[in-house]
Structures are given as structure tokens and as C-alpha cells.
Design a protein with these regions (language model features):
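Hydrophobic/aromatic beta-strand patches that form the interior of the parallel beta-sheet core
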Residues: 4, 55, 94-96, 145-147
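A glycine- and Lys/Arg-enriched "phosphate-lid" helix/loop adjacent to the NTP-binding pocket
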Residues: 62-133
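Conserved nucleotide-binding/hydrolysis micro-motifs of P-loop NTPases
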Residues: 8-11, 59-61, 100-105, 151-154
């Protein structure tokens, strides 16, 4: 499989955004939008040896963040650009949403130790979590698997990871929910 990761560290506005979101929100979101579009265009180049493609984001991810970070005028302009770009974006065969409660997300943010995220407010993460929940509640574009990760740690616990992998191997159509218990 070919793995395509979000390149957050290439966004020169992101550290400033965490210090002053109102001032740097638009630049940060526009950079991410254009960066993801560039990645999507690179994915269009057919690789005959890679049949499976994995990404750690959806193209729409940036719009979800933008809805929290931009004022009305900025969002209007952002939407104009995003609507032009998203026509050329590859549609995924399956979306997996790793859902967690805000406390778990805050713990995970702390554990990954990114200096620029150390002062991120739990209220912001909670609002973002709500935006994602509402988005996936209405999502119908492709098969969707929602995995509740609040009570598991698939990074440190191989049994948790194996349980998820075994579930993903099943055919998934429509919207499915997986609520594993900690091993």
C-alpha cells in the first residue's frame, strides 16, 4: 500500500495560528487546502504497483477546521476556492473515522508532544470533535466505518490493532460502527 500523510509540518503558518488563531486562521487553512489539493493531484498519477492507497485525512478535513477558524468573509472566499478544487479530488473507497471523546483526544495530543500544540484549548478540540461528529452523522458519499477509540490504544497495544484490522477486513457497505473494548 502507498501511504500518504498530512504534511502539517510544512505549513509555515501553523505555529503562528496556535498563538493567534484569528490573525493566522485564513493563511493556515488556505495553505492546508492547497497542500491537500497538490497531494490529491499527485495521487491521480496511476501507480501500477500500488493497488492500495491509504491517507490519514480526507480532502474535506480542512473545510471542517475552516468552519471553526474563519470568520464569515474568510469562509466565503475559502469556500469559493475549495469548491473549484474539490471537483478534481479522488473519492475514497472507504472512510475510517477514528472517533474519541475530547479527554482522549487531549491525552493523545499531549502524548505526541508537538511543541506548537502544547497550549491547545480543550474547548477548541471539543468544538472540532462536534464538527466531525455532525459531519459523519450526515456522511453518505462512500462506505464509512466509525471506530470508537476512546477505550483502546491501537498504537501501543497490538491486540487492539489486530481487532481493528480484523474488523476492517470484513466487507463494509453503508455506515458501520465498531466499538472495541480495551484488551
Amino acid at each position: 500500500a502507498r501511504l500518504v500523510l498530512e504534511e502539517f509540518d510544512e505549513n509555515p503558518f501553523l505555529p503562528d495560528f496556535y498563538k493567534d488563531p484569528e490573525r493566522y486562521g485564513f493563511q493556515t487553512q488556505l495553505f492546508f487546502l492547497l497542500q491537500r489539493y497538490r497531494q490529491q493531484q499527485e495521487l491521480r498519477q496511476v501507480d501500477m504497483f500500488q493497488k492500495l492507497l491509504l491517507t490519514d485525512y480526507m480532502f474535506v478535513k480542512d473545510r471542517l477546521f475552516a468552519s471553526l477558524n474563519l470568520n464569515e468573509k474568510e469562509m466565503y472566499l475559502y469556500d469559493k476556492v475549495a469548491n473549484l478544487l474539490e471537483k478534481n479530488v479522488i473519492k475514497p473507497d472507504l472512510v475510517i473515522y477514528l472517533q474519541a471523546d475530547t479527554d482522549t483526544l487531549m491525552k493523545n495530543i499531549s502524548l505526541r508532544g508537538r511543541d506548537m500544540e502544547k497550549d491547545i484549548a480543550s474547548e477548541y478540540i471539543d468544538a472540532l470533535n462536534q464538527v466531525y461528529t455532525e459531519y459523519f452523522f450526515r456522511y453518505q458519499d462512500t462506505p464509512l466505518l466509525i471506530i470508537n477509540t476512546s477505550n483502546i490504544d491501537f498504537v501501543k497495544n497490538s491486540k487492539d490493532l489486530d481487532e481493528i484490522i480484523n474488523f476492517i477486513r470484513q466487507p463494509i457497505t453503508g455506515k458501520k460502527f465498531f466499538n472495541p473494548l480495551s484488551n
